[in-house]
Design a protein with these regions (language model features):
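Short acidic/polar active-site loop segments enriched in Thr and Asp
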Residues: 97-100, 125, 153
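A short N-terminal helical cap/helix-turn-helix that marks the beginning
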Residues: 2-19, 36-63, 82-84
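Conserved ATP-dependent adenylate/AMP-binding module captured primarily in the ANL superfamily
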Residues: 128, 132-156
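Conserved AMP-binding/adenylate-forming core of the ANL superfamily
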Residues: 33, 54-115, 133-144
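Short hydrophobic alpha-helices that are characteristic scaffold elements of the AMP-binding
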Residues: 117-128, 149
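Short polybasic/polar patches that bind polyanions
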Residues: 50, 92, 120, 148
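Short, contiguous pre-domain boundary segments
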Residues: 20-31
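Phosphate/oxyanion-binding loops and surfaces in catalytic or ligand/nucleic-acid-binding neighborhoods
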Residues: 51, 122, 153
């Protein structure tokens, strides 16, 4: 059996200084200077959508009717970028903002990820919420608390 191949991983910060603040508070400061980075998480998606548009960004196994795993469904960088832009515009058109965020009440999926990316592009906060809060709960107290706390403009 062949062992999987791994490439070396460079960690950015390897040394920190610790400073105590008020009781129970600690501050960590990196000793190495911060290297150049993308300002927004979506900047990297945009970069790869232009650089490697047809390369796979995310994938999932399609579940067959009998419960077995079928073929892989791939989303390319270009598809993800365009879909995220479309979602972002839809959120803006609907007036969503920091006071009216999106609650994502769905399982981990490609659609969940794309909705999150669209929210990031639009500058709209999103709150991933555990599906059992609505599917398994009898009293829905946890779901009610989430919805009362964030006052969503949309539930996905």
């Amino acid at each position: 059996m062949n062992a999987p191949k791994f490439r070396p991983l460079k960690f950015g910060v390897t040394r920190v200084t610790l400073r105590d603040g008020v009781p129970g508070t600690h501050y960590l400061t990196a000793e190495q200077p911060l290297q150049p980075f993308a300002e927004r998480m979506t900047d990297r998606l945009q970069h790869w959508a232009k650089t490697k548009p047809e390369h796979s960004f995310m994938a999932r196994r399609v579940k067959q009717a009998d419960g077995t795993s079928g073929d892989w469904q791939h989303i390319t960088y270009a598809q993800a970028w365009q879909t995220a832009r479309n979602i972002a515009q839809g959120l803006i058109d609907r007036g969503l903002n920091a006071e009216r965020p999106v609650v994502i009440l769905s399982e981990n999926s490609l659609e969940h990820a794309l909705m999150g990316l669209g929210c990031m592009l639009a500058g709209v906060p999103f709150v991933p919420t555990s599906p059992p809060y609505s599917l398994v709960s009898v009293d829905y107290d946890k779901l009610k608390h989430v919805l009362k706390t964030v006052t969503p403009g949309m539930v996905f």
